[in-house]
Amino acid sequence: MAFASDESASPWSSTRLAALNAQFEPHGPKAILNWATHTFGDDLAQGTGFGPSGIVIMHMLADLRPGTTVFYLDTDLLFPETYELCDDLDERLDVDVTRVHGGLSLDEQAEQEGEELWNRNPNRCCFLRKVKPLRNFLDDRRAWITGVRRDQSERRADTDILSWEGQYGVFKINPLANWTQKEVWKYLFEHDLPYNPKHDQGYPSLGCVPCTEPVDQADGYSREGRWSDRDKTECGLHTSPEDEDGAHAAES
């Protein structure tokens, strides 16, 4: 399927974005990614935490445009299994896996902010170790691919396939927005792709070790177990500055 491709205006009008979203909705993620790679070329990058959705997209990108940049935000607090999976996927798939780090060590953060900031002010911790590094990395990009899906949480239920992210100055592409968790796992198994073994140990979603716990029984959302003792569901990467109790106001 060939979609309209005109990259002269940035950001594009809301009317144009709505029209493209309407075009994308009935088509599969590979068609959307094909449009994205042809439209944005080297100015495109996928961000992933190596969850099932991200791995599906990595596999598709390796086929559509080998060498595409796939980056992950290394907070220094990821599970050992996540780092191992990263290395495995880097060897298996023809994409350019890139580590993004904010440059602030955990010791330096403790000196500046106090010990275990993630327990006292998780929004501030997420800003320093995730949001700020992401902003810096995307500064010279035009488009960012994510694995966000509508069925992951109530907050994500209205996710568009294509949107303009003003806080980062890029177009955000969610090719799996209308896929279900079942479809994602079906794709993984059909293509014999690896996944994080922690998913078999009661972890629906994996982030940083201190802020992620297993759950006894999931309620259908794949982001359960994140900040389970708090009224917090997002790290701030996919929310506006006004969301999450002013998560991004934590930068001040």
UniProtKB/Swiss-Prot annotation:
Basic and acidic residues bias: start-end ranges: 221-235
Cofactor detail note: Binds 1 [4Fe-4S] cluster per subunit.
Main location: cytoplasm
EC annotation from Swiss-Prot or TrEMBL: 1.8.4.10
Pfam families to which the protein is assigned, alphabetical: PAPS_reduct
GO biological process, one term: hydrogen sulfide biosynthetic process
Record field: catalytic activity: [thioredoxin]-disulfide + sulfite + AMP + 2 H(+) = adenosine 5'-phosphosulfate + [thioredoxin]-dithiol
Cofactors: [4Fe-4S] cluster
Catalytic residues (UniProt): 235 (nucleophile)
Residue positions binding [4Fe-4S] cluster: 125-126, 208, 211
Pathway noted in the entry: Sulfur metabolism; hydrogen sulfide biosynthesis; sulfite from sulfate
SS bond partners: none
The organism's place on the tree of life at top rank: Bacteria
Keyword Nucleus listed: no
Stated family: Belongs to the PAPS reductase family. CysH subfamily.
Protein name per UniProt: Adenosine 5'-phosphosulfate reductase
Gene that this polypeptide is encoded by: cysH
